[in-house]
Each structure stands twice: as C-alpha cells, then as structure tokens.
A protein has these predicted regions:
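Conserved Class I S-adenosyl-L-methionine-dependent methyltransferase catalytic core
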Residues: 9-105
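Conserved SAM-binding loop of SAM-dependent methyltransferases across substrates and taxa
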Residues: 114-130
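S-adenosyl-L-methionine
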Residues: 143-176
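Short SAM/SAH-binding signature in class I
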Residues: 176-182
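A short, conserved alpha-helix within the catalytic core of class I
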Residues: 186-198
Length: 199
C-alpha cells in the first residue's frame, strides 16, 4: 500500500490519521452538524443574541442524554431554562479553565444531583478546550448517582466518577482544580462550601 487513512469521529471532533512511508500525520476538525442538530440550534425560544458555549448543534448527544433535547434533537420547552442556566454557568467559569495550565483539570461537583453541570463541564473542558480532565460528582442520593454513572457509561465518559456520600464526612482528593455546585437544597450549599475548604 502507498497510504492508509483512518478517519473516526469522537463526539464533536473528526480525527484523520494518514500513514505513508514518510510517517504518520494526524488532522483534527470539528464535526459538521447534522440537519437535525442545526434545526435544534435554531430554536426561536433561545436567546438569539447570545453566543452559547454548549452549542446544541455540536453537543446534541450530551444534551439528549441529560434530557435537554428530545430523541429527535429538539430542545424541550420545559428544559430551556435549565439549558440557559448551565450554559451561563459555563460562561462564568470558562476563563478560569482557559487560563489553567495544569496537565489535568480535576472538578469536584458537590451535591451533583442529576449531574447536569458535571456532564456539561466535562464536555466543555474535554471537547471544546481539548484538555484532559477528571470529574467527580458527589451526592447523598444513591439513585441519582446510579443514573449519573449509567449516563457517563452510555456517553463513553470514562473520566467521570460518581460517589454516593454525605458531604459532611466526605474527604475530597487534594488535587482538585475547582469545586463546583449548580445549586443545592437545604444545607447542601453550606456542605459544598465546607467540602471545598477541605479539598
């Protein structure tokens, strides 16, 4: 053979490897959005003047898995507020991660609940910034931890860990880059802050 070419798609990136007698070349490009994904991104209920960091046309698999999109790729009306909330959160913390020069970003999501923020931050850091990251979600409710583990498995996110633990006694790892929490009920906000001081 004169040349072998392997092309594969990993979430939002198309990777092409070319092997010749001269060596190996690798090219990466953003995956072209499908017509279905483009239609979902053009939803008139979204803020058309806003530049979304978690774009519906690029993150459709993730947004479908966490329940923001329908099976056919349309933004659910009752999830538009949640989508705006998590995207705005990413917008607020993005500069911190864009400037981080560590080998690996480690996020700890306290009182992670359904893990919307864990999954979206993982997507943003890994797929948009192309950085190595590890995400740890902690919640006291076993059923939400089980579901988060199942979603991570379905998405192929092997860098995510979900732990069922009480934040009052949970001992976080020492190499945490940032502690995050979307919102917490009752005293969970206080517990998340307490956990952050121990990380």
């Amino acid at each position: 053979y004169d040349e072998s070419v392997l092309t594969y798609t990993e979430r939002s990136t198309v990777v092409t490897l070319s092997v010749t007698a001269r060596g190996v070349q690798m090219k990466q490009a953003e995956r072209e959005a499908t017509a279905e994904e483009k239609a979902a991104a053009a939803n008139p209920l979204l803020d058309s003047g806003r530049q979304y960091l978690i774009r519906v046309d690029q993150a459709a698999a993730l947004l479908r898995e966490i329940g923001i999109l329908t099976a056919d790729g349309k933004l659910k009306n009752d999830m538009i507020r949640k989508y705006n909330q998590i995207d705005h959160y990413v917008e607020l913390v993005a500069p911190m991660f864009e400037q981080d020069d560590s080998d690996e970003i480690v996020l700890l999501d306290c009182a992670c609940g359904k893990s919307y923020l864990s999954f979206v931050m993982n997507y943003y850091i890994h797929e948009v910034l192309h950085r190595r990251c590890r995400v740890i979600g902690v919640d006291i409710k076993e059923h939400v931890i089980d579901e988060s583990r199942a979603m991570a498995k379905r998405l192929g996110y092997h860098n995510m860990t979900f732990i069922c633990a009480d934040l009052r006694t949970y001992q976080p790892p020492k190499n945490v880059t940032a502690v995050i929490s979307l919102h917490a009920c009752d005293i969970a906000t206080d517990l998340a802050l307490g956990t952050a001081t121990r990380a």
